[in-house]
Amino acid sequence: SNISGQHFPADLCPKDIAYRCLSTAASDILAMGGLPTSYLLSISHPKPTDEWFNLFSDGLKSFNSRYDVELTGGDLTFGDLNIAVCFFGKAQEKILRRDSACEDDDIFISNILGRGHHGLVNYKNLDQNFFLKPELPINLTKKLNPFINACIDVSDGFLKDLGRICSASKKGAEINFSNSFVLSDLDDLIRGDDYVLCFTAHKKNRKIILEISKNVHRVGKIISGDAIKVFDESKKELSFVDFGWDSFKN
């Protein structure tokens, strides 16, 4: 469910609202090792107009064409602006879960962190596609699927979502921070809205994973226990007040 003013700016063009809502929903399918195929769409709107729905439809068509998916049904009602999307997908070789990380697994991200936040700040000016049109790593997912143990997409913040893998797998994590895998600074670890994949894999697969794409970064490893520890390049442990976005607090 995407609420105006919370999940997207209230003044956003309807075409961009549509594309972003579909992207963020389809990302969950990729995080489980699937490929998105179709979706249901429910819309509540306080002042529906033909112009708004024509622009919104343009966004749907653009996404559908880009990722070869289709709208198969839904609902429309009066109310505050809210876009609810339910995606369906087709499993690949492996269905990926959050509870399958193993001790000593490498931790990877499929692209750098911080682009979503940067795109939100600049959505009226520069780099708007980072926020408005998150790029779904469809082809990358196909190639990586056989090598992944556990996976999640980064929506609420890298450390927050990594914590969900750790909690489900009953493990901890050690992250070695580097500016090479963030757009701006340390806070990119917790800002969210990136919609990249965070995944773990056996060390024996490290070389082939890094050869699959230059955008993939190894950022740490899974450890015993339940703590998530972050170290800077001098091996000093870093601390955070929060690990990311909380829909019921933020």
Where are these regions (language model features)?
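Helix-biased detector of long, well-ordered alpha-helical tracts
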Residues: 1-250
